[in-house]
């Protein structure tokens, strides 16, 4: 402790000495300055003159020297600017590094002074060296400051340039800025230049490698983004409708963000009241969960680096997780009506506060207006703020719990999109005239596109963009059909999937019963099949879609749930196991292939009862003729043989699974009700049941073995002989197939198992896509001309037959009455 006190006292003494020495040096420097006689010599009250008080070196007469006249470089002086620099840097937090440097300089100066203690007899040369060092450091600091200021100014100028380039007027007056943007856009993306997208959006377009906008995107963007109109859009499937409404939404959000940034630079924190941060800006409603997730994925890809959050709200997932994501306050929400209304009715704050909602989108709107579907949509529409008389620029005070917000009231834009939108001529005229009010249905149901648009708050002078052609179908899709009996549909389906099993294929069914029947048969026949229908859980749905996307030659058997908007790449073939109930559903089914300028094939399996429906369907699309899908009937016996075994196996397994399900159901409910099941079977019956089970299992095993042997060999045509064939008649294709077959057998012997699906399926025929087979051999066509007369004859004969049956039944009833009367009278 004593030594510590001594050291502290010594340090104090040294500091005092250094301060004294510093003062003396300053006085000496001041005394050595040349003085001017700017002030006359006078005397004060005590009689002393100013010259005696402020006497210089004796070289010049006395007087004051103004600070402007002092040049510190001439006198080797440095002005004490350290404190002022520190205060300036405290105001600007970006210059923390400079403040640290100045503090280090101060510490170094003190250390240098401490080291110099005890050297009272030091020469003036050392002082000059330290001064020079300090001057050099001060100059360095000034240069660093200048460089940092230049960098800041450059950043500000660049930001201003970007803002000026993005804030292009809606009327297109700034031609110079457009030229600058066109020069910056790469030549392969030059088609986007006319749309005047925000620079950040253009970066997303480059990253996604979209070379040019689609027709619907180009037509909708200028109308929606720059003119601010509501849009009713219709275009063929796979035409990019998601970005047609997604790009205007992102463009407006980015423009508003820049405007708020400019206001913040002018007005400071007052500009925050003009921002709508933390509120829902766009609400997109889709009919299916899969479509909602797909739209979310597309928008997230487009808004990846834009700091715009997109959240899906769909059923089949935990609502708690979705509520957590809504607490992040996303700008865009993509939802299905059921789960959206569930969260809205529960009072979810982010979904209920819709005063800042700028966009309301209905995707696949024609599906939402079907009778009996989406009753929640009516309740959602009732919650939307009224937009009958929008006043742009006026502010609206909104009470939110404890705070009162001044939010700018803006026009809400409504987008209605689908591949098939049928608007009546009266409704089109009504929209053009601008009469917003119309007669709604007495029940209040949303049962048409017209009512849906009006209830959603569609404003006057709406833009109707209808890019559908008379055929409505995609231009590169090729239609075909196979005429067959109802029992033969399974055989022809298996023929297409095995003989032409290349590329992704979707098989559409009208019922879940048909779906389970087909998937069960095809799985027994060794095909890797995915299923998708509404009764599946959401996790199983997503797994099924992922499996289908992962397989290049995948097969998806689905109901019309998949027909709406789902975008799966490289779907080559669509098979209609049964025709849909409406032409709109047929369009959406076919729209899963031939998407985004690609080609595809559609095959319809037509039974006799569906011929008239198919004719009317083709005529509604203005088809002059339809190709008949080419079939090689020499392979059909082998197909039928395999299918016969598969059906027997399927029926046995189905019967057994039903019995087990019934047994477990009885046991479960008996246990829950605390009841004992009566075992009425005798021992003989039990023995018979055991024998029957053993016999069925033995038969099942035998059928499975027989089918596995057939599946282990490639499918052969009827006339082909595996034992005797002339060497001259063997083609090069067949020779290559035999070599490949030998390799497969060797691989099977090494593995010791059964290869589930083989590359070599058919002898003497290449495994090609159905589209290639259709182009190669589909010359036979069914012409639609002249079918109307045949159809009329069929209808007339059918009416005549029904009339005759009706007359016969009536005569029979009369005869029966007469007989009863005779019996009663006798």
Curated annotation (Swiss-Prot):
One of its GO terms (molecular function) is RNA binding. This is DEAD-box ATP-dependent RNA helicase 13. The keyword Hydrolase applies. Keywords: ATP-binding, Coiled coil, Helicase, Hydrolase, Nucleotide-binding, RNA-binding. The Q motif is unique to and characteristic of the DEAD box family of RNA helicases and controls ATP binding and hydrolysis. It catalyses: ATP + H2O = ADP + phosphate + H(+). Residues 94-128 have a biased composition (Acidic residues). ATP binds at residues 235-242. SUPFAM superfamilies: P-loop containing nucleoside triphosphate hydrolases. Residues 49-58 have a biased composition (Polar residues).
